[in-house]
């Protein structure tokens, strides 16, 4: 852990970490887009029901 020599990270582990990072970023982008769009949609829906 801290101060201990660490072994090299294998290419497989690097690739797995990269894929997980990309997946997380994609998911975060979808959530951000949803949170940005949902108030507009909610406003339009409420307007239609008046």
Curated annotation (Swiss-Prot):
Forms part of the TOM (translocase of outer membrane) complex that consists of at least 7 different proteins (TOM5, TOM6, TOM7, TOM20, TOM22, TOM40 and TOM70). This is Mitochondrial import receptor subunit TOM5. Component of the TOM (translocase of outer membrane) receptor complex responsible for the recognition and translocation of cytosolically synthesized mitochondrial preproteins. TOM5 is involved in insertion of preproteins into the TOM40 translocation pore. Residues 1-20 are annotated as: Disordered. GO terms for biological process: mitochondrial outer membrane translocase complex assembly; protein insertion into mitochondrial outer membrane; protein targeting to mitochondrion; protein transmembrane transport. Keywords: Membrane, Mitochondrion, Mitochondrion outer membrane, Protein transport, Signal-anchor, Transmembrane, Transmembrane helix, Transport. It is a single-pass membrane protein. Its main location: mitochondrion. The keyword Repressor does not apply. The chain crosses the membrane at residues 27-45. The keyword Nucleus does not apply. It is found in: Mitochondrion outer membrane. Belongs to the Tom5 family. The lineage of its organism: Eukaryota, Fungi, Dikarya, Ascomycota, Saccharomycotina. Residues 1-26 are cytoplasmic. GO terms for cellular component: mitochondrial outer membrane; mitochondrial outer membrane translocase complex; mitochondrion. It comes from the Eukaryota.
């Amino acid at each position: 852990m801290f101060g201990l020599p660490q072994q090299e990270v294998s290419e497989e582990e690097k690739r797995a970490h990269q894929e997980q990072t990309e997946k997380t970023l994609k998911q975060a982008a979808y959530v951000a887009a949803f949170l940005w769009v949902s108030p507009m949609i909610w406003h339009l829906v409420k307007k239609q029901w008046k």
